[in-house]
Design a protein with these regions (language model features):
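Extracellular/periplasmic catalytic domains that process cell-envelope and extracellular macromolecules
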Residues: 71-76, 101-103, 176-180, 243-246, ...
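Structural recognition of the beta-strand scaffold that forms the well-ordered cores
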Residues: 78-82, 107-111, 136-138, 183-186, ...
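Surface-exposed patches in mature extracellular/periplasmic domains of secreted proteins
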Residues: 56-68, 110-114, 133-142, 228-234, ...
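Cleavable N-terminal signal peptides
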Residues: 11-12, 20-25
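Short, low-complexity intrinsically disordered segments enriched in A/P/G/S/L with frequent Arg
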Residues: 3, 7-11
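Aromatic-Pro/Gly-enriched surface loop or interdomain linker
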Residues: 24-79, 83-87, 191-192, 198-301, ...
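Short alpha-beta junction capping motif
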Residues: 6, 79-120, 301-342
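An acidic, glycine-rich "communication" segment
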Residues: 26, 32-36, 46-47, 117-197, ...
Length: 449
């Protein structure tokens, strides 16, 4: 749970982009061209910050900077804000600078001025250039950004949004997530005019109250994720040293259309702890393959994870069916316990095996015996609140039985963050030791069954 009065050290709103950081938080807008390009709503961010000070007891400040004035150190400008109406592009040097800044813990917010399609298209194109390996994806309603302060499941739009063809009442926010953290966010419809306080029905925008609530949530989320991002970065560096460690038994992470890699360090860390815990002279080589690739049959275990909804092609489903029916094990987890992936995974596996059930694995199963005797696991604070305040609970793994052995093992709660010893503040997951023990036991099961 994030303290609702937490102060973000510094906010920098750039005229080309905008930044947020901490103490008596200062923000900055980045300057480029004349005011019409970056400052059509000059009081937008300031109004939001002033309202936050009076209504949610959060103290932020803002300043305006050019991109060249933005520090690559997120401690100096933790959040950047960029708004506009027209096409734009970064230079290769700016893209490299932004990528490093974002991976080191920074965050950038893009606001489409009056729902501008040219500006939105430019953001989508540039983020693909900056993060070719991680697609921009629309956030579903259970994402922590929509619940970090207010519960924002539904919003109010202007008539112009309806005339543009959008009929929903949920917020339309897209993001690039790295290691379970939003690093870049784009609002498809304009938030800034709502913060400014004046909204006309022929503008593609959120109504003021909805814009304010979304803005508060975004900044509260950014604040709570700052310190955590440092730990996640350290875990990634540690994982880099582990890649060459294993070379014997292949474990394959499933690649699919969407964000299939939510954590970069967790799996390698867990694989190393398995060797240390068991003393078994088996090293794991980690591969990343699509289900349609023949190489999956060289791996006794497939690992699959994600945050949001996904779909597999009929070819991928047929290949996965063949793999499991021939003795392979699919181990999947809903990273951070996100409900979008949970629903999609259950629908997918049921469509492949309609006559079978994904049942909860009983506590007396061998799966919970070796190499760790597991009767209960610790949970994250988010999951604790759902279980009536219990800090520990029986492990919840689900399995699909194939002739006396599990061909599918699934966790609806996040494990990978625990493997990295850095669960997200918003995760519905298992704590560090519990996640490692479950992961080790699943690996042992795959080797012995």
């Amino acid at each position: 749970v994030v303290p609702r009065h937490e102060v973000l050290p510094h906010v920098a709103a750039l005229l080309l982009a905008a930044g947020i950081s901490g103490a008596s938080a200062q923000s900055a807008k980045e300057l480029y061209g004349n005011d019409i390009y970056w400052n059509a709503t000059p009081n937008d961010v300031n109004n939001l910050l002033k309202s936050m000070k009076t209504e949610v007891d959060a103290n932020f400040q803002m300043d305006a900077r050019r991109m060249s004035e933005v520090s690559p150190n997120p401690e100096q400008n933790p959040v950047l804000f960029r708004s506009g109406h027209y096409n734009f592009s970064y230079t290769p040097e700016q893209r490299e600078k932004l990528r490093k800044y974002l991976l080191d813990g920074g965050m950038i917010i893009y606001n489409t001025g009056l729902g501008s399609q040219p500006f939105y298209n430019s953001v989508v194109r540039e983020l693909k250039e900056i993060f070719p390996e991680q697609p921009l994806q629309r956030l579903t309603s259970d994402h922590p950004i929509f619940h970090s302060y207010y519960d924002v499941d539904k919003v109010q739009y202007t008539q112009a949004v309806r005339q543009a063809g959008f009929r929903g009442d949920e917020p339309w926010i897209e993001a690039v997530e790295i290691n379970c953290r939003v690093v870049a966010l784009v609002s498809r419809w304009c938030m800034a005019v709502g913060w400014q306080g004046t909204v006309q029905e022929d503008w593609q925008a959120y109504q003021p109250d909805s814009a304010f609530r979304i803005g508060v949530n975004i900044l509260n989320y950014a604040s709570s994720m700052r310190a955590w991002a440092k730990n996640a970065a350290q875990a990634m560096k540690f994982a880099d040293k582990l890649k060459a460690y294993s070379d014997s038994v292949s474990m394959t992470q499933v690649v699919y259309d969407g964000v299939w890699k939510t954590r970069h360090a967790g799996l390698p860390v867990m694989l190393q702890t398995f060797n240390a815990r068991t003393g078994i002279p088996v090293k794991f080589a980690l591969k990343e393959l699509r289900l349609s690739e023949a190489g999956i049959y060289d791996s006794p275990i497939l690992y699959m994870t994600g945050h949001e909804h996904f779909e597999l092609s009929s070819e991928d489903k047929a290949s996965l069916k063949k793999y499991i029916e021939n003795g392979g094990l699919l181990f999947a987890e809903s990273c951070c316990g996100r409900k979008g992936f949970d629903a999609a995974f259950k629908a997918m596996i049921t469509s492949i095996f309609p006559s079978k059930k994904l049942d909860r694995i009983p506590l007396d199963s061998i799966l919970f015996k070796e190499p760790n005797e597991i009767k209960a696991v610790g949970v994250t604070e988010g999951l604790m609140q759902e279980s009536g305040g219990k800090a520990r609970t029986e492990p919840a793994l689900f399995g699909m039985d194939f002739g006396g052995h599990y061909g599918v093992i699934y966790s609806p709660f996040g494990l990978a963050g625990g493997w990295e010893m850095s669960q997200s503040p918003y995760a519905r997951g298992i704590n560090d030791s519990g996640a490692l023990h479950l992961g080790q036991n699943i690996l042992m099961y795959s080797l012995t069954n």
